[in-house]
């Protein structure tokens, strides 16, 4: 399944100019951050290694430390932009991309049965109508307990643990340099 392609530009009061990063050591003007959120609540001892964590951070402390860091950056004149706001801005500017985004997210989560694809889409669309709320939920992940149960008679459903993550959280988003970096007028996605 192809990745989402979007060649337009989101229009808003904070209309983003093109990316143009030519130095890794020059003055920082703008930074993309993600404030730790509910994705940390879906970390479990069993998922730590897979999600590249050594320990489960305590959410209130992680948020407090993040806020202090973001305030230091702002105090130095750096514009702080949040990843979740950028994603919501794109989806609000191009509403037709919402379902394509959800389909791609479900595909990337490894959901292959049509039953679960529909259950997850219905769950997201019914419970997260606001674009930013929907983006935040995709970052947080989905636990099997959250979804309505259907009697599907599929083997995968019969052996599933009630605490199983159906869609894994993305706790590494607050290390925004790890998944991608701006180089010149492009982006390197790792």
Task: Identify the residue ranges that each predicted region occupies.
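Short, low-complexity intrinsically disordered segments enriched in A/P/G/S/L with frequent Arg
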Residues: 10-13
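The feature marks the mature, well-folded catalytic cores of soluble enzymes
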Residues: 16-190
